[in-house]
Amino acid sequence: MRFLALFLSALLVLLPGSAVAAVTLAFHSFNGSYLGGRYPHAFIVLDGTLDAGGQRVHENYGYSTSAGALSALRGLVPGIIQIEKEKYIASTNNHFTLTISDAQYAAIRAEVEAWKDAPGQKRYSLDHRNCIHFIARIAEMAGLSAPVPQEMVRRPKLWLNYVTRLNPQLGAREVR
């Protein structure tokens, strides 16, 4: 009887869908391209399967502005949650990835919603509330140290490398 129980337990491990569910949270930067019309940017990618219910997750979020770059230099402008295309994500720097719980995933999704501007609101600030501040908040929610020094607020890759150094438990290397 004991052998049968062990055999069935081993068999369950091999069946499809019996793998441990997990969602990963990855932090990305884009170097920017004046020819391509994109400025430096930082965003997150959530990927995997939730433990509760087995829902598949494949999402990404960044914080940007719908106003032009010159407007953003002058002060507060409308902010938007920006979702990137797969082709764009493939061209970015993946700085580090960590596994998060279902509860952390739910909290991060709530934070994404909280960053959405209501119609008529202007909360995006190039120096005080930009893509770096957005993912810094999410990094903190995931248990990372992620302060934003003023000299890094417009330099996503530099800032994510800084966060990499502050969090050696990630086992990540700086992106060159």
Regions found by a protein language model. Give the residues of each.
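Bacterial N-terminal signal peptides
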Residues: 5-15
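Extracytoplasmic/secreted proteins, especially bacterial periplasmic and envelope-associated proteins
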Residues: 38-41, 45, 107, 130-137
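Sec/Tat signal peptide C-region and signal peptidase I cleavage site
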Residues: 15-22
